[in-house]
Swiss-Prot record:
It comes from Mus musculus. It comes from the Eukaryota. Residues 1-28 form the signal peptide. Keywords: Glycoprotein, Secreted, Signal. This is BTB/POZ domain-containing protein 17. PROSITE patterns: BTB (PS50097). InterPro entries: BACK (IPR011705), BTB-POZ/Galectin-3-binding (IPR051481), BTB/POZ_dom (IPR000210), SKP1/BTB/POZ_sf (IPR011333), TRAF_BTBD17 (IPR056184). GO terms for cellular component: extracellular region. Glycans are attached at residues 61, 100, 195, 307.
Length: 478
């Protein structure tokens, strides 16, 4: 065991010399072992090295630095007998901190102190096991001590495990904002948008900040039952958070009232505590919604613009906007189905429906990959294998007519994944308005594999949504 105290000027050089000598001896031994064999044969004993490093950390042999970690607000102190060389290899901050002292007191928050042993283990072995609740404190430690590889690793873990539960997504979003991690912030925001119904029904909904709420309310890709569900979720948030009146009124004005049927609007005006308190702030929007429902969209568009966000549906799961489709054994063969949606959200079109036909093909081959004949004898070039194809989904109207004048249809397909008994949205694919299919639909999915992330009990869970998009009429001179 080395003595505690300031490191000697030659200690780093001696340590590196020892490592270099070990490397030369190991290399010579490997050459001797493979003396008569072909060049390039490798012997990999890296797992033995990892085991030695674990033993070194656990036993504290030849340690030259003691880290004492105290949890803030407690008297609890944990001591770690470590080696400045190994700590300094990963962290420039540790290299500076330990350059002239052999014992350091570190003060960390309670959650960071609780995982400090995992953090130190990573510096020795380059690996650790992470739980959801440990992600933020580990990322904080990696950021504080400038361990870039662990920062990236934990951030990747958080993005990959957002579907592990709606609770972490809210906390992780706020953490990403505080640290400036834009990639993690956007991943959390996307997960929350796609699974808003689950988020709004959880205890974490009250922890949503006004800034996050504003970000969500302005999005058109929110997945929820209907706009009325969003209003009730907002009203519940207002009751818990009790924000200033300006924040509450701004949030209430983000609701898309034309997407709510008139009968439900009447009930909201009569029973909603939020509208009773802030009704004057949204009176113009309610009047706009009633006017929209009272006239045909074509007539309304002659006097008002209908291409604003208030007239654009979100991703509603209600039957009027689409239908679920569960495809068992999706890799087996082609499937087809049909469903109906309402012509538009206007009350004037409440009884008018459009029928849509859907075709799913698990192994569709583009023309460029299909077998062709190249010579006069009719000899075929090698045919493309079935696995060379990609999944394809085509959505077409059963008939066309004048009912859709002034409106186009935006199609969206949601792909669900089950986690801990819940079905969450894992992916969403949007079609171009002029297209009948999404070009990248399940482009990287392996439907042959039963444990594919896209499958739930060997079934593909889709939800097909068709959103009418209104266009402002172009007036022509008479």
């Amino acid at each position: 065991m080395l003595r505690k105290g300031s490191c000697k000027p030659g200690s780093w050089g001696s340590f590196w010399a020892i490592l270099a000598l070990v490397g030369l001896v190991t290399r010579a031994a490997q050459r001797a072992d493979v003396g008569g064999e072909a060049a390039g044969t490798a012997i990999n004993h890296s797992h033995m090295l990892l085991q030695r490093l674990q033993d070194l950390l656990r036993q504290g042999n030849a340690s030259d630095v003691i880290l004492r970690v105290q949890a803030v607000g407690t008297d609890e102190v944990r001591a770690f007998h470590t080696h400045r060389l190994l700590l300094g290899l990963h962290s420039e901050l540790f290299r500076e901190l330990l350059s002239n002292q052999s014992e350091v007191m570190l003060r960390e928050s309670r959650d960071c102190a609780a995982v400090f042993d995992k953090f130190i283990r990573y510096l020795y072995c380059g690996e650790l096991t992470v739980l959801l609740a440990q992600a933020i404190p580990l990322h904080r430690l990696a950021t504080k001590y400038r361990v870039a590889s662990l920062q990236r690793g934990v951030a990747d873990y958080m993005r990959a495990h957002l579907a592990g539960g709606v609770g972490p997504a809210v906390g992780w979003y706020h953490y990403a904002v505080s640290t400036g991690d834009e990639a993690l912030r956007e991943s959390c925001l996307q997960f929350l948008a796609w699974n808003l119904s689950a988020v709004a029904g959880s205890a974490e909904w009250g922890a949503v900040s006004p800034e996050l709420l504003a970000q969500l309310l302005q999005r058109s890709d929110l997945v929820l039952q209907d706009e009325l569900e969003l209003f009730h979720a907002l009203e519940a948030w207002l009751g818990r958070a009790r924000p200033p009146p300006t924040v509450a009124e701004r949030a209430l004005r983000a609701i898309r009232y034309p997407m709510i049927p008139p009968a439900q609007l009447f009930q909201l005006q009569a029973r909603s505590a939020a509208l009773a308190r802030h009704g004057p702030a949204v009176a113009d929007l309610l009047l706009q919604a009633y006017q929209f429902h009272a006239a045909s969209p074509l007539h309304y568009a002659k006097f008002f613009h209908v291409n604003g966000s208030a007239f654009l549906p979100r991703n509603y799961l209600a039957p009027a906007w689409g239908a679920p489709w569960v495809i068992n054994n999706p890799a087996r063969d082609d499937r087809s189905t049909s469903f109906q949606t309402q012509l538009g959200p206007s009350g004037h079109d409440a009884g008018r429906r459009i029928t849509w036909n859907v075709l799913f093909s698990p192994r569709w081959l583009p023309v460029s990959l299909r077998p062709v004949y190249a010579d006069a004898a009719g000899t075929a070039l090698p045919a493309a294998r079935p696995e060379d194809g990609r999944p394809r989904l085509v959505v077409t109207p059963a008939s066309s007519g004048g009912d859709a004048a002034g409106v186009s249809f935006q199609k969206t397909v949601l792909v669900g994944a089950r986690h801990q008994g819940r079905l969450l949205v894992r992916h969403a694919y949007s079609f171009h308005q002029s297209s009948e299919e999404a070009g990248d639909f399940l482009a990287h999915a392996d439907l042959q594999r039963r444990n594919s992330e896209y499958l739930v009990e060997n079934a593909l869970h889709l939800h097909l949504i068709v959103k009418p998009v209104y266009h402002t009429l172009i007036r022509t001179p008479s």
